[in-house]
Swiss-Prot record:
Single Gene Ontology MF annotation: zinc ion binding
CDD domains: GAL4 (cd00067)
Protein name: C6 finger transcription factor traC
Originating gene: traC
Biased amino acid composition, Basic residues: 80-94
Naturally occurring in which organism (per UniProt): Penicillium crustosum
Amino acid sequence: MNFSEQFTGRSEPGRKANRTSNNNTNSTTNVATVTTDDSNRPACDRCKGQKLRCIWENGSNTCRRCTRARAVCQQPRPRPFGRPRCSTKSKHHVAQNQANTKIWVSSTTQQPQENDAEMPMATSDDHDPTSFLSSTAVDLPRYLGLASFPTDPSLQIAISPPHGVHGNSFNLETGLLGNFSDAQFKNPATFYQPQGFINAANPATPAPVPVPASAPVSADGASLFEFDPDDISGDSEHSHCHWLKQLGDLNVAIYQHPLHPKPAGVSTPGVSTGFSAEQVSLSSLQIGRLLHMTSRLGRLTEEIDSADHVQPKNDGSAESDSFGGIKLAINDRSTLFVVLSCYVRLEETFAQALATVVEIRRRGPLSDDTYQLMPRLTVDGWSLECCQTMQIDFVIYICEQTLVRIRRSITSLHADM
């Protein structure tokens, strides 16, 4: 409205018509904006990050700015209303779970008593199978159920604790389990010569296995043991503890083998600290005993694996391939740890045996002891007793193949851990 219209109340017809058309156009634009704007929807991430107004069209999945920029338009997730949900576990269940994750730890200042005295306890980590070895005061034989080992007569070979290990203790440097009573060392009848091992005095005749005087005897004269050493199946109640005891016996027997490398400064009675290729003879290597323990460990591993899977993998024969492709599903990590410890010791022992035999083979002529590695090996009636070089080559091949399979098993066990 101009100056003349304000005082006269008149206006030109042309201007009034233009003003009316402009008002109609603005009203139409406002109506269209209101119908197309969806103000109930939240701003997208792009507009919210740039602190811009987000305008949504009805029936469109993208806002105006994202549509023009051809960008991805994402809406934030709606926030939950109210308080967060309370935990379903009560304090009683939490306290019970914490009590189940504790293990007994032997203290050097406090000894266990008979009148149910409490012992210091340490919490174990469920994700680390070796976390219970963080303290040097851990009573490992009692934790693994090995308080009464060695119990397997086929592996009890004059075992004696090394110097510096007393009572129920565990030496982390040597890894030797020292949980033996004085009566076992004073009574020679409690230790046996393994059945089937080669006798150094007469290789063709295996050493007999004497029966201890304290062993119970049935009516027919057969000795009765709590667990049969050759029967590794067992029932569901005692099989797991029986396997742990046999694995502990194997671990000690492998450590007592002459070819097992000994740490510096540790001297064990009856066990040499090392070998020299110029002084050692083939009769002192005890390779047959090492192969026997390896086969026994493979059978134990397969038996534990088949028990965990309910269905056995094979018939349990000693001639089966026991070292390749092991995939354990052991629920108790202590069993897996002991199995892995045995395989690691076997790897070190076979590596030492292979290096020693190769050095003897490279040295040239053999010694005058004429020890036969395989006295009964024949090919279609022809004996190989006089072919000592061929026998050594065959032993080297066996050690190489066994070492490869043991390392493959160690890799598989590490994957299970």
